[in-house]
A protein has these predicted regions:
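Sec-dependent bacterial lipoprotein signal peptides
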Residues: 1-21
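Beta-rich carbohydrate-recognition modules and glycan-binding surfaces
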Residues: 23-213
Length: 213
């Protein structure tokens, strides 16, 4: 009698496992893996999924409601002088807490200016992983607003990208200064030729581009 009971229990367990396995097969994994394709990073305020991580002087970032390219506010970066005890440079990364599908875009664009003539580094893909890092060195800024375009190579691979925008800047002539960023967003420009090599020159682009392919 005990033998028959044991067999019956085992068969019941097998039946339950088979039933659960059948249910699992009905789940659409493509739906589960879908990430939002939001374009905005900062348009007067942080996008809904946006987080910030400071580098260098941790208090370098703020929101400015007086100096803007368009709208009601901009990002303000206070670059410290080299002797600042809280940090000798300013940097930070803006990232998505969940990840975004950027496959439909070919560039990150924004407007920028500085209180003095300077050169900074900007890019995308510098959070959690740098597999698809796009780094632009020597971006020239001055007191006038300029539109900056960061081309995105291989955007079809960016299905769950977290690193949306980063910046890095140091003092000029041992003095601190201010940088502003505004209207930071991803766009589909359709006019960019994405070379898959490093340190390339892009016509009309103010800087040296390093692409991770």
């Amino acid at each position: 009698m005990n033998h028959k009971i044991n067999i019956s229990c085992k068969l019941s367990v097998v039946a339950v496992l088979f039933s659960l396995t059948g249910c699992t097969r009905d789940i659409n994994t493509d739906v589960l893996a879908t990430y939002p394709n939001l374009s905005d990073v900062f348009i007067d305020e942080f996008a809904s999924d946006l987080q910030y991580q400071a580098w260098g002087k941790v208090t370098n970032f703020g929101v400015d409601t007086e100096t803007t390219y368009d709208g009601t506010s901009s990002m303000r970066i206070e670059v410290p002088n080299p002797s600042d005890p809280m940090g000798s440079w300013a940097g930070g990364t803006f990232y998505s807490a969940t990840g975004r599908n950027l496959s439909g875009y070919d560039a990150l664009t924004f407007y920028a200016k500085s209180s003095v003539a300077t050169a900074i580094e900007v890019g995308i893909g510098n959070y959690d992983t740098t597999e698809y890092l796009v780094q632009v060195n020597d971006v020239q800024l001055n007191t006038n607003w300029s539109k900056i375009i960061i081309p995105i190579p291989n955007s079809a691979k960016l299905l769950s990208e977290k690193g949306l925008f980063y910046y890095s800047a140091g003092a000029v002539n041992d003095e601190g200064y201010t940088i502003w960023f505004d209207e930071v967003k991803f766009e589909k420009l359709g006019t960019l030729a994405h070379a898959k090599i490093e340190d390339i020159e892009v016509p009309g682009f103010p800087g040296k581009l390093t692409i991770g392919t």
